[in-house]
Amino acid sequence: MLSTEMPLPTTGSTLLKTPASPSPNQNLLPLTAVINKNGELEIGGCSVPALVEQFGSPLYILDETTLRQAAQQYRQSFQAHYPGSSQVIYASKAWSCLAVVAIAAQEGLGFDVVSGGELFTTVSALKQLGWDEAEIAEKIYFHGNNKSVQELQEAIAINCTIIVDNWLELETLTKLAADSGAPVKIMLRLTPGIECHTHEYIKTGHLDSKFGFDPNQLEAVFTYIAQQPSLHCLGLHAHIGSQIFERQPHKDLGEVLVQWFTKGLTYGLPLTELNIGGGLGICYTESDDPPSIEEWAQVAAISVAKACDRQNIPYPKLIAEPGRSLVGSACVTAYRVGGRKVVPNIRTYISVDGGMSDNPRPITYQSVYRVALANRMNDEITETVTVAGKHCESGDILVKDVALPAAEPGDIMVVAATGAYNHSMASNYNRLGRPAAVLVNQGQANLILQRETYTDLLRQDCLPNRLLS
């Protein structure tokens, strides 16, 4: 799209919502983002161009204040709107590293993990914080549709709750639990058959999904578990998808889950927990309009409470699993601008020093982002360009047709809302090292992920001796 074919905003400051929404997921940039006296983007009291100068690029910049406020809003919202007990657990697949786990733990969150690696990372962080074995066991929930025997054994060893996804896993756990000599805590994941409007790849609640037990399997599952003294079934779980703006699907989910929860009680199962998953969306563009954290929590909490009242059952412990809406808006990625290519009457390309290896979402989900020049936030916007990554791949486009000042080599470009599923989905494509990440707060910047070096890229390589002869 040519710059003459669309109205251009005035400056890069349009990324800053004024006033900022108190709910982090409703902003493009972190809550602490401002433009300083030099016309530079500042986050957490730190100049973004100065951070790039110190730590290099590409660079993930995570704002501690935004992450903490999102966590606090989730906890406070469920406490305010749900009459029973509640627990917010962080869906660590969004971004799993020691520092993010530590912050979430300090804010009273539990953890949803989906692999042995995420489990190891979470347990490592919690031990460094001084948590004991009982605290760790209580706060971790292990997900996944194809957990290995080794992963199940690791989960059993720390006594965390395992969310069972299918018959094979259930039967495997029965044997492993018997071998361990102690009951294993489980929950059941069901597929509720609820549709929501989001990308096909991140829908999980409709019937045609790889996750969970279908409703027509549940009574047989209840019967089986009731006969297994080694399995202690705490409750039910469902997750209907991600990046959801609608309220109705989670209202419906609460009602469906409570119906099956009530049914499970009639089989004598000691159900006490109900896990509604996550899915609240965030702003990636100005036109995105997700509910606030409190609005989402209120809808879900009231739906479950009213359904329990209708069924005349005690309120179960209500669990929610936000991921994207906790970390997504708390982070930006900074790049250095490189070359320019002008295709007359078609498109202007601006290349940066990262791309699909540090943010695969555009090529995977056709995700749309907003960008600005962090060193020239007040400069007049003059053109529409397409931001290209540096990979040997035609599809390596970070943002299409975005309005910017005339970018020059060495400018610092930031992509907004990159906290979720950027670092966690990053790769070494074209043998690029994964970027560093810094945590910023009140003018202080701390490295939380080191930049991978060439040596790191070879760390797992093996060269057989026979190839050297």
From Swiss-Prot:
PROSITE patterns: ODR_DC_2_1, ODR_DC_2_2. InterPro entries: Ala_racemase/Decarboxylase_C, DAP_deCOOHase_LysA, De-COase2_C, De-COase2_N, De-COase2_pyr-phos_BS, Orn/DAP/Arg_de-COase, PLP-binding_barrel. Its cofactor is pyridoxal 5'-phosphate. Keywords: Amino-acid biosynthesis, Decarboxylase, Lyase, Lysine biosynthesis, Pyridoxal phosphate. Pyridoxal 5'-phosphate binds at G279, E321, P322, G323, R324, Y421. GO terms for biological process: lysine biosynthetic process via diaminopimelate. Specifically catalyzes the decarboxylation of meso-diaminopimelate (meso-DAP) to L-lysine. This is Diaminopimelate decarboxylase.
